[in-house]
Amino acid sequence: MRALKVAVAGALACALCAEASPLVLAERGKAPSCSVVVEKGAGPTGAYAAEELVMFVRESTGVTLPVDSWAWPWRKTVRIALDESLGDGFRLETGWRTYRITGGRRGVLYGVYETVERFGDIIFFGDIRTHVPKKDAFVVPDRFRDAQQPAFLGRSTTWKEVRTNIVSRTRLRFNLHRRGTVVEPKFGPEEIKYVKEFGDCHTFRDLVPPDEYFAKHPEYFSYLNGIRRKDKSQLCLTNPDVLDIVAKKCIAALDADPSANAVGVSQNDRRNQCQCETCAAIDKVEGSSSGTMFRFVNAVAERVKETHPDKWVQTLAYQYTREPPKLTKPADNVLTYLCVIEADLARPLTTSTCPASVKIRELVDRWTALTPNLVIWAYSTNYRELLHTFPDVPTLQDNIRFYRDRGIRRLFIEGGGYHSHLGEFKTYLISKWLWNPDVPYEELERKFTDAYYGKAAPQAREYLKMYREYCAKCQSKMRWSCWVVDTPEKEYFPDEFIDKAMKIWIEDALAAVKDESEDVRYAVEMAGLEPLVMKFDRWCETTPRVWVSRHPETFAVPKDAARLYKELDGRFRKALKRGRDIGIGNERALWQWPRRNWKALGELKRPAKGSDRAEATCRVVDTESTSRGDVVKDGEAAGGEAMRIANSSSEVGVYFRMANVAFDAEGVYRLRARVKVEKTSPNAKGEAFWMKLGEKEVRVNVEDVAADGYQWYDLYEGKLSRDWVFRIGCGNFARGGGVKAVKDLRFDRLEFMRCE
């Protein structure tokens, strides 16, 4: 017994002497000398935190730490404990042979991730991969102390890298989850989790479906211009039956999904708010349509609170509801998302003199004066050009700081799809700055590029330096909202920038990673998508596809199109093999349509002889049209296919640039279109369709359509301009209770004929 006491005393003395030494949790090639202890009450998140720590230490050092419920006092331990008062926060501290990770039900996980990031140099990128460098030992410094709380209580982004992957979302410390995300208890409770039945925005159509209610109750829907609207409508928010329907559906949805803590009650994604006498009177008193909206949402929230006092009713301050009401305040269980979609993303909100950004600063101040439960819905992508360069990275940090300093507690930043403009990098930056907006950009850029691009990190930083220089130039040119169209005339990022970016990514960076892992090579290849797409889109806007010139040799065609198309197409195919839908998943607009466009350029050949007649078929036009039209099989069309134009009032179905036509400047041309109009009835009245070229406009009424089937309609005769655009769309119908005059409208081709 005396010998045992001496041995124990000796061991304790040695330990005390070594107290000032770093705590080695694992050493490569040695048996584990440290245990992970999950303390009582840590729950499923504590157990999962231990699993994550063990996994990352093993991947880093090759050593698997045992997980125990207790350990001898002299054994080295990592202790994981729950303190619910910390919420998302955590405390990290080293003691005598002990490293403690204490956090709230999410914070305990975040404490583990902070540990492996800080001491294991591990970097989380999203659902593509995690960077885990190999180490000889996993070491925690002696006398280490750290306590953290996030800058924002709620943090989220919809960049595709983390949109639906709960593991990645948790590792990057995002905690606002959207509809359809399944969250197990081990990930901790979500800050906001919406019911499965409805989403978190634009829910009116789901709550009161027009197909279910309009026929018998048109009074439930917007009153506009003397009629109740079924399509492209909102709800009549002063109708008591609408309130009953919505409140009951919200309560039922919360009953059916006990894990949810929020239900969305918000306008459809358009304007057309109800202008009936009662709604209009409230809007006038409140100074905004938000008055009617928030009176309605508050009434729903009051009923929800009776059965679900701890649940949120979420709504939007967006478009026609973004102006705060003068009299009504959101109820204490209403969560208001202020959508700042109009912001100029190229200039910091704090200093921008752009009227849209000045207005947003004002709106943030006015809304925060009304409610502490304001969530900012911000944006970090360009929906008109998802795969083009966008100048928002230099302003991201400043804008996040702006919201932090204004007292915003929850921030959601909407993003794009896989491999959209710097999506992987922006996901990483957003995750770090929503937690701590003061982390220096340079530190994050270095960590990300070293880990993500491997040996191509110098080239990546060269590109980012050049990108930021051009972004500074963008600030003096225009307002960069999330709906900006790039054209050669505007050249927001000039051809010089695109050519330099192509050299960096397609030549220099690829050469640097030829011996790297497949993941690193893939990352570099996908970075090259952006300049390739921009190059092809610029070419597409200026390269002839229709030849009606007597001198075709005078028109330039891209020399490298065929070679570069192979580069571009190869990247798309590799992305699809990995299950990456490029862009935001709009299959026609972001996969079939651009690739047809780019492929046509890759196969383009200049005709050997001149011509006085040519046709722009629906397929040629489709490369430039908007998503309002779809190419369909049509036996009556000359080529067996036609463009079916969406049957919506006044919307453009076909858009075709004269810059894509090789014509002679001195020539006089006659243009006509082959179109088919299918009436809703023989006696239908109203405008069937319209066509426009330059200043010339032709409108055709339904009653003037003489026969069924395709007919030729004259459009223009004279000289042409490369600046002109041919457009065709459905007309402004005599709706008569919402019934359209045209059942179907199809475009076959546009004919060009030289007259002299």
Model-assigned labels for residue ranges:
Residues 32, 41-44, 49-52, 56, ...:
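Feature activates predominantly on carbohydrate-active enzymes
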Residues 66-88:
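Short, well-ordered secondary-structure micro-motifs within conserved domains or adaptor modules
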Residues 241-244, 252, 355-458, 462, ...:
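Structured mid-domain segments that build the active-site/substrate or prosthetic-cofactor binding neighborhood
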Residues 407, 433-630, 634-641, 646-665, ...:
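Catalytic domains of carbohydrate-active enzymes that cleave complex glycans
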Residues 654-656, 679-693, 726:
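Beta-strand acidic-aromatic groove motif in beta-rich domains, primarily in extracellular
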Residues 655-682, 711-718, 750:
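Extra-cytoplasmic beta-strand recognition segments
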Residues 693-725:
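Extracellular carbohydrate recognition and processing domains
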Residues 734-755:
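Extracellular carbohydrate recognition
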